[in-house]
Amino acid sequence: MKEKIVIALGGNAIQTTEATAEAQQTAIRCAMQNLKPLFDSPARIVISHGNGPQIGSLLIQQAKSNSDTTPAMPLDTCGAMSQGMIGYWLETEINRILTEMNSDRTVGTIVTRVEVDKDDPRFDNPTKPIGPFYTKEEVEELQKEQPDSVFKEDAGRGYRKVVASPLPQSILEHQLIRTLADGKNIVIACGGGGIPVIKKENTYEGVEAVIDKDFASEKLATLIEADTLMILTNVENVFINFNEPNQQQIDDIDVATLKKYAAQGKFVEGSMLPKIEAAIRFVESGENKKVIITNLEQAYEALIGNKGTHIHM
């Protein structure tokens, strides 16, 4: 059976100084060119992606247009909107590449829900800032309308709403994603970490939270029984003691050593550490699992073993 890969795109894949749709589509076009050799390979491919800047813009738009006739949409709905928007952009550019290659592969996006535990202790300590900045006076008014919401000062720039970042428990659409990926389809899923939902009797209900995209990508890779999780970020390799005089590049490492480095605080919290934690979970999820961490430009070279950081048992 051909290798199955989950590619977790970092925010730099859609990074641009302009927030227009055209500018973001151009950034994605350039990003996808780096993945062209993978699309031309026999590998079965699922792509996940971030949505930070995009959902931030959506939330600001919702706040500014909020009225009785155009009420602001909640965070889970905005997450779904961003998945559709970015998925559409990715589909367009990947389809362009597949057509140029005369490939018979197809590409599609699955709006993805991710189940979280309503009793996750992270709900008691919201830390993820979202949406626009507010003044102290604006926050006082908002608290009257949203008594359960939490606002925190953000580096002297004003106040922002903060939400929880619970751990993913399951991917509701994972069987569909697996079926599509096992065919000739390139599947885009788990955008922005997925839409967080909790079980309510015989259905699921969206909650106001943001799931770490690396943790969601790991959970997806585990559930669809992928062979490789490739996490694409803005550096070619993982380093211990990054940006310090004694920084050291890691090319190949086993999980036991990686755990030791993580326990010693060798990785930056909120930056490389979540990627390391996701990597450890995936490698330990089954036999012969591997994780590659590198940048977008070196994705194919890393896949064939020439670049990047390779993590294994």
Curated annotation (Swiss-Prot):
Main location: cytoplasm
CDD domains: AAK_CK
Family annotation (Gene3D superfamilies): Acetylglutamate kinase-like
EC number annotated for this UniProt entry: 2.7.2.2
Subcellular location: Cytoplasm
This protein's GO CC annotations: cytosol
GO terms classed as biological process: arginine deiminase pathway
UniProt keyword list: Arginine metabolism, ATP-binding, Cytoplasm, Kinase, Nucleotide-binding, Transferase
Enzyme class: transferase
Biological pathway: Metabolic intermediate metabolism; carbamoyl phosphate degradation; CO(2) and NH(3) from carbamoyl phosphate: step 1/1
GO MF, one example: carbamate kinase activity
The reaction(s) this protein catalyses: hydrogencarbonate + NH4(+) + ATP = carbamoyl phosphate + ADP + H2O + H(+)
NCBIfam families recorded: arcC (TIGR00746), PRK12352.1 (NF009007)
Family indicated by similarity: Belongs to the carbamate kinase family.
Protein's name in the database: Carbamate kinase 2
Gene name for this UniProt entry: arcC2
